[in-house]
């Protein structure tokens, strides 16, 4: 690329939006094929192409921001607005699940026995694994903030340790959630209660896995000296996302586990 003599965000020609779109097509059609014909081939192809696209697209962005110096203050401002809009869209995504839950629980139909939880459903105890999960995610929110402050103060070792701890807490949360799903006394097929419970908590769990991956990428970059005390928006975006995941869990815990039980 020719030397950039201005501060603004000019995107180079890239094949990754096209390969990402093809991967999305393969994933969605592959999911339908898996459900109806029990074949995983198309789904596996879509997943592989999506992973390769993500790795190479992120590699290009890291090169532009870290080695080529293209992430100037106006570009960083645009990236910040982009991340804020993305998180706003995620808020509305989860709003749909809360709407479905409250629509079903505040006025239970005769088919549900006129009560909530519906007749025949044994809800999970909110003061057992769900409470531990809440403590784990809140602790991870503290450690990710510790990472940010350490980065801003130039304390590299502390930042690396705190970020590692955050990722471990995220993985612990995922393991606890998997155990809870395995031992749950109801399934996704158990009416509207099972559906809203597993879809809402399942999508949140997926977001925890995505956030943990995002933070793991930041840990690798931190080890490779990509971040400075004043230039670390990649980590900031991951931290914002992680705090969003924390807040969604608090609403899920209070609504579905505690009030809904």
From Swiss-Prot:
Mitochondrial matrix side residue ranges read 1-15, 67-72, 153-155, 224-232
Q: Which membrane topology term applies here?
A: Multi-pass membrane protein
| Keyword check for ATP-binding | no
An annotated Gene Ontology molecular function: cytochrome-c oxidase activity
Q: What is its EC number?
A: 7.1.1.9
Query: Which GO BP annotation is one of this protein's?
Result: mitochondrial electron transport, cytochrome c to oxygen
Segments traversing the membrane:
16-34, 41-66, 73-105, 129-152, 156-183, 191-223, 233-256
Task: Tell me the compartments it is located in.
Answer: Mitochondrion inner membrane
Catalytic reaction equation(s): 4 Fe(II)-[cytochrome c] + O2 + 8 H(+)(in) = 4 Fe(III)-[cytochrome c] + 2 H2O + 4 H(+)(out)
Topological domain spans for side Mitochondrial intermembrane: 35-40, 106-128, 184-190, 257-261
Tell me a GO cellular component. Answer: respiratory chain complex IV
Enzyme group, top EC level?
A: translocase
Q: Self-association or partners: how does it assemble?
A: Component of the cytochrome c oxidase (complex IV, CIV), a multisubunit enzyme composed of 14 subunits. The complex is composed of a catalytic core of 3 subunits MT-CO1, MT-CO2 and MT-CO3, encoded in the mitochondrial DNA, and 11 supernumerary subunits COX4I, COX5A, COX5B, COX6A, COX6B, COX6C, COX7A, COX7B, COX7C, COX8 and NDUFA4, which are encoded in the nuclear genome.
Q: Briefly state the protein's biological role.
A: Component of the cytochrome c oxidase, the last enzyme in the mitochondrial electron transport chain which drives oxidative phosphorylation. The respiratory chain contains 3 multisubunit complexes succinate dehydrogenase (complex II, CII), ubiquinol-cytochrome c oxidoreductase (cytochrome b-c1 complex, complex III, CIII) and cytochrome c oxidase (complex IV, CIV), that cooperate to transfer electrons derived from NADH and succinate to molecular oxygen, creating an electrochemical gradient over the inner membrane that drives transmembrane transport and the ATP synthase.
Give the protein name, as stated in the record: Cytochrome c oxidase subunit 3
């Amino acid at each position: 690329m020719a030397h950039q003599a201005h501060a603004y965000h000019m995107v180079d020609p890239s094949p990754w939006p096209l390969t990402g779109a093809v991967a999305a097509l393969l994933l969605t059609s592959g999911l339908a094929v898996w459900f109806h014909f029990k074949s995983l081939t198309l789904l596996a192809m879509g997943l592989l192409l999506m992973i390769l696209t993500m790795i190479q697209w992120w590699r290009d962005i890291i090169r532009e921001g870290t080695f080529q110096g293209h992430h100037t203050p106006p570009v960083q401002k645009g990236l910040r607005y982009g991340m804020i809009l993305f998180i706003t869209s995620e808020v509305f995504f989860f709003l749909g699940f809360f709407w479905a839950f409250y629509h079903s629980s505040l006025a239970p139909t005769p088919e549900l026995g006129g009560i909530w939880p519906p007749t025949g459903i044994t809800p999970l105890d909110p003061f057992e694994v769900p409470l531990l999960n809440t403590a784990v995610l809140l602790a991870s929110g503290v450690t990710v903030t510790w990472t940010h402050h350490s980065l801003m103060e130039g304390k590299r070792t502390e930042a690396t340790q705190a970020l590692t701890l955050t990722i471990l807490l995220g993985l612990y949360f995922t393991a606890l959630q998997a155990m809870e799903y395995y031992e749950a006394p109801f399934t996704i097929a158990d009416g509207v209660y099972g559906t809203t419970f597993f879809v809402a908590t399942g999508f949140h769990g997926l977001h925890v896995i995505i956030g943990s991956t995002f933070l793991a990428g930041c840990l690798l970059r931190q080890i490779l000296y990509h971040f400075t005390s004043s230039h670390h928006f990649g980590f900031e975006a991951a931290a914002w996302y992680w705090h969003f995941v924390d807040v969604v869990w608090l609403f899920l815990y209070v609504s579905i586990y505690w009030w809904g039980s």
